[in-house]
Amino acid sequence: PALIAAGLMGLALLATGSRTPLVATTLACAWLIIACWNKRSAWLLVCGVLVTLAVVRLYPEILLERGLSYRPELWAQTLSKVAQQPWQGFGLDAQLAILIADLNTSFSEPHNFALGVLYYTGIIGLAIWLAMHALALFQCWKHRSNYLFIVAGALLVYGIGAGLTEGGGILPRPKEHWLVTWIPLALIAALSIRTRQTQGALR
């Protein structure tokens, strides 16, 4: 049943034609395989690699048809703006406008979570942001015997994958991106606190 459900989910993802959830789901599955490593995980890893190669071979247009969707241009312009105030950023209430001349359209997000954090809070804020994620993943790995940490880690890894090519304005106000950023971090923090309290009560 689990394999059937996974297959249906994979087909649904392919049907959307969106590459971001494909990348994010692949990374989340990789986390689950590594965190729950056993003989079955090895077989799943092999099957996953074979399926990925088959999709790339049979349906290359899914990945290549739309090119890079102007992501490099968005990132380059964001970095050029960051260079003006690299350490402290422009502040949480700052406005970001990235003009793509070919589209005659201005974007308000860099389509990358880390670049968004860098723009608003600078290198200092980005360092804190990365440290939070590193610590959260470390806690999930450390307590991987608890399936709740494994699930929370998968949510966080999914968010990291999604944040590679989407979003950017995740700090000023609540929005849908919080479902794959702040909420997984909050869940991991809550699990860590509860685990520490439980361990302290047993001593």
Label every PLM stretch briefly.
Residues L22-A30, I124-I128, K175-P184:
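Membrane-embedded alpha-helical segments of multi-pass membrane proteins
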Residues I123-I160:
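Hydrophobic transmembrane alpha-helices and their immediate junctions
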Residues L155-I160, I170-R203:
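Transmembrane alpha-helices of multi-pass inner-membrane enzymes
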Residues P1-L58, S145, L187:
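Hydrophobic alpha-helical segments of polytopic membrane proteins
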Residues L58-T121:
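Long extracytoplasmic/lumenal interhelical loops at the membrane interface
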